[in-house]
């Protein structure tokens, strides 16, 4: 990340995103921490703005808010939705300005809209073969997001593209040219059930059930 020839490390933790610099002798030291990003479930690094250093997209699954917008303390800081949820944690694009100095460029790059969808994973790849890295985000509880890199440090939302807005419960992503036509194809793994009856964790969804039922099923 600091372009000094060795591999650095970036981790998602409950204390935020933490970047460790490699001193070149096998020792890593904490360089910078982002405490406002405590719910990262996935990350992807690439030089999206082609300035010579790696930038990072962070998928934040949880939000600090519940449905009423209040701050919660303890585990499970938000309810578990069923479908098409938009109250997850906001995803963040961290632009590397050199020397391990990262700046939140989400708004500037056009990635700040419709980006709170309980995102599990992201993938950078040049899907349109124009020489820059595009971005796809796998979202739990709803449609995925796809952004085309405009080559000028910004992105255009193409989430309505066929096969992207599939409404599944996105868990993972991988790309390869499986049909050898020179274009990257995409596989999105999902955890999905079409069952009409579901067991939900929210206590208000099963308030009318007796104690034995709650202990057995929940």
Please report, for each region that a protein language model flagged, where it lies by residue.
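Acidic, glycine/proline-rich Ca2+-coordinating loop motifs
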Residues: 1-218
């Amino acid at each position: 990340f600091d372009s000094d020839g060795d591999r650095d490390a970036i981790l998602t933790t409950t204390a935020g995103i933490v970047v460790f610099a490699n001193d070149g002798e096998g020792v890593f030291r904490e360089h910078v921490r982002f405490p406002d990003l405590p719910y990262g479930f996935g990350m992807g690094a690439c030089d999206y703005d082609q300035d010579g250093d790696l930038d990072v997209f962070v998928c934040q699954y949880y939000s600090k808010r519940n449905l009423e917008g209040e701050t919660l303390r303890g585990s499970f800081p938000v309810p578990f939705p069923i479908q098409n949820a938009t109250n997850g944690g906001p995803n963040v694009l961290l632009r590397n300005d050199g020397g391990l100095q990262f700046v939140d460029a989400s708004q500037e790059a056009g990635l700040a809209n419709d980006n709170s969808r309980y995102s599990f994973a992201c993938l950078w790849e040049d899907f349109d073969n124009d020489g820059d890295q595009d971005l796809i985000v796998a979202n739990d509880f709803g449609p995925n997001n796809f952004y085309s890199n405009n080559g000028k440090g910004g992105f255009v939302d193409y989430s309505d593209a066929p096969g992207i807005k599939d409404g599944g419960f996105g868990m993972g992503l991988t790309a390869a040219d499986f049909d050898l036509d020179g274009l990257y194809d995409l596989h999105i793994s999902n955890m999905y059930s079409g069952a009409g009856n579901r067991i939900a964790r929210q206590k208000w969804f099963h308030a009318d059930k007796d104690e034995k039922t709650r202990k057995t099923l929940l």
